[in-house]
Amino acid sequence: MKMKKFVLRSFLLATLGCVAFTSMAQAEERVVATVDGIPVLESQVRANMGKKGDRQSAIDKIIDDILVQKAVQESGVKIDPREIDHIVEDTAARNGLTYGQFLDALDYQGISLNTFRQQIANQMVMGAVRNKAIQESIDVTREEVVALGQKMLDEAKSQGTAQKVTGKEYEVRHILLKLNPLLNDAQAKKQLAKIRSDIIAGKTTFADAALKYSKDYLSGANGGSLGYAFPETYAPQFAQTVVKSKQGVISAPFKTEFGWHILEVTGVRDGDLTAEAYTQKAYERLVNTQLQDATNDWVKALRKRANIQYFNK
């Protein structure tokens, strides 16, 4: 239990390392700066200086945190309590604790459950406000992603560190009915159910039905076949149906953004996802770089609008 408490303590220190606004009861403590009238106290600076003892960096960090907290408070963003419940439960589980043990561990650290929940809520709101402020500034093109992904893959190969990534490719055929003024959801679903029944009963074949009825004319001319592809290349609902379908079994009618479908998985094989994996890594690197830059720019913008005063800097 002591080890679990130590692990949890480390987690709490990392998770809840937000600015602790010092009680105004410490009236005799020296004020080193103010941010829109909010004081920055000497004890806060000492608590944030760390081993390097960089006083100015500590003051700037506190000021930035105050500005972000103000932006959060002014945003009006609300967090669903159920989301906080989930995070609390997940935190306990990841630390190998029951809910009761987790509460005991919090108490051991001198932290009430309400305080812990409020800290989580503050961080979630802060993230939402920040993301809303900077999301429009993120601009990553497909060309940039592909080029960087290929460069990263080539470097990994030359260094002998490239690892092959595989995933399931599915061979799929489908029949699509598109909605129109003469065909609503109920009618399309009913028609596809009838087509499915006829195929299963042997009254027609999937290929013939696709050629006759499918509004995906390209695949319809090929018996409804879409060939082999990774599920991620399809619309979400289509991909989900592909993955959960048993090979050789025609799915029930389902709807996507394109219309109503039935599909059949006719083959499964392992495909090479190595290039795609490095493309994803490249995308994450580019986005994270821009995100950090945008975050810094956002905080700088908050500073420009704020009234910041230093005393005995």
Swiss-Prot record:
- GO CC terms, sorted: outer membrane-bounded periplasmic space
Q: What class of enzyme is it?
A: isomerase
Which GO molecular function annotations are given, in alphabetical order?
Answer: peptidyl-prolyl cis-trans isomerase activity; unfolded protein binding
Asked whether the keyword Isomerase is assigned, the reply is yes
Sorted keywords for this record are: Chaperone, Isomerase, Periplasm, Rotamase, Signal
Enumerate the catalysed reactions: [protein]-peptidylproline (omega=180) = [protein]-peptidylproline (omega=0)
**Location within or outside the cell:** Periplasm
Pfam families to which the protein is assigned, alphabetical: Rotamase (PF00639), SurA_N (PF09312)
Which EC number(s) does the record attach to this protein?
Answer: 5.2.1.8
UniProt record, GO biological process: chaperone-mediated protein folding
Q: Write down the InterPro entries for this protein, in alphabetical order.
A: OMP_Chaperone_SurA, PPIase_dom_sf, PPIase_PpiC, PPIase_PpiC_CS, SurA_N, Trigger_fact/SurA_dom_sf
PpiC domain ranges (all copies): 167-267
Q: Which first-to-last residue range defines the signal peptide?
A: 1-27
Q: What does this gene product do?
A: Chaperone involved in the folding of extracytoplasmic proteins.
Stated name of the protein: Putative peptidyl-prolyl cis-trans isomerase SurA
Q: Name its species.
A: Haemophilus influenzae (strain ATCC 51907 / DSM 11121 / KW20 / Rd)
